Structure formats: C-alpha cells, structure tokens
C-alpha cells in the first residue's frame, strides 16, 4: 500500500470514528486526541509510517466534514461505521 493510501485510510478511520462519537451518540468513545494517538499506534504496528498529528487532524477533519454533508441516511452511516470500525474501536 502506498504512503498516500495509508494516509487516506488512517485519516478515514479517524474521521469515521469521530462521526460515530459526535453524530451517532457514541459517548463511550474517547477524546479526539486519544483517537489520533491510537490510529498512529495501530498504523505503526502494521508497519506503516506514522503521520504528524497536524497532518492527520487536517485531513481527517476534511473527511469528517464530507461525511456530515453526505446525503446517506445517518442511521445507515452509523450502522456501517460501527460494523467496519469494530476492531479499531476495540483498540481505543
């Protein structure tokens, strides 16, 4: 997987986790800083490059904004993200 693909995937995981927290009422999810640190830790465990927090915040915020603008029903997004992010959420 290219560095750009890793970057996009990592930012997408962070954005979708934040979406669950703020839009799907997942109050059990930790602070954004913990989500970011965990995402970088998991990336390093996979042998990926760690991203700077600044880069990850900017890119994940852009993706989060696009997710909030997406016309897919919120319940569908919440269900999909809960299912797809189960392993990552268990790392938090």
Question: Where are the predicted features?
Answer:
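Compact alpha-helical subdomains of small soluble proteins
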Residues: 28-92
């Amino acid at each position: 997987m290219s560095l750009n693909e890793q970057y996009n995937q990592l930012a997408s995981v962070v954005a979708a986790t934040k979406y669950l927290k703020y839009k799907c009422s997942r109050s059990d999810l930790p602070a954004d800083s913990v989500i970011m640190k965990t995402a970088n830790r998991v990336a390093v465990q996979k042998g990926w490059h760690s991203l700077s927090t600044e880069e990850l915040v900017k890119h994940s915020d852009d993706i989060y904004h696009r997710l909030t603008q997406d016309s897919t029903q919120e319940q569908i997004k919440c269900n999909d993200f809960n299912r797809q992010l189960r392993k990552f959420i268990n790392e938090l």
